[in-house]
Amino acid sequence: MNKKKMDLPKCQSITVACEGECSQMYNLHNPLTFEMGLGNIFICVRCFKIHFCNMLEDCNLINTHEGCVCSKTGLFYNGWMPAYSHTCMEPTEEPNMETVNVVVVLLSYVYSFLIQNKARYSNIIRDIIKDGKFIEQVENAVFCTFNKVFKNSTLNKLPLTTVSQLFVQLIIGGHAEGTIYDNNVIRVSRRKREDNILKKMRIEYGNALAL
């Protein structure tokens, strides 16, 4: 039986809000998360809210004798490295949306970078991250930018790590009050091809934010 592929809106919100806490969090396992080394990205199968389970602001932690467990995901933390709890049950339904998966990985990468460098980027975090996730305006703008700039042919020529680093530079540059890049951020756009892509991303991201 042929599956009907869901067409996603390019510049509209794609979420349906859950009442209270999300009850079905799916752990994303795909080549994209494997390449990025991100094994603790979760997405609600209903509203597509992202949860980066890293024992920080958005986790609901329960202390046990062995360590901490995040009640949202069932991840068990012994120190700082997450591992699956034996009682963790994952929903069997996976969102059949490749683009959503890619954007979730990109957003999680940018989120992780900002949190890990929060002393430098505290003003940006304050403005665009609320309750442990990006505000809806930023999420939608990233989705629009990805759809406009990155086609299959472009993605095949660029590692996902490079695309993620371009989004880091895009979001920092788009929301910083001044120039606060460090060398690790701007290094990715020093090559001509990546610099040209970043210029297109800035145009599309700015247009999406203005909607």
Curated annotation (Swiss-Prot):
The lineage of its organism: Viruses, Duplodnaviria, Heunggongvirae, Peploviricota, Herviviricetes. It comes from the Viruses. Belongs to the herpesviridae UL92 family. It holds the Pfam family Herpes_UL92. The gene is U63. This is Protein U63. It comes from Human herpesvirus 7 (strain JI) (HHV-7).
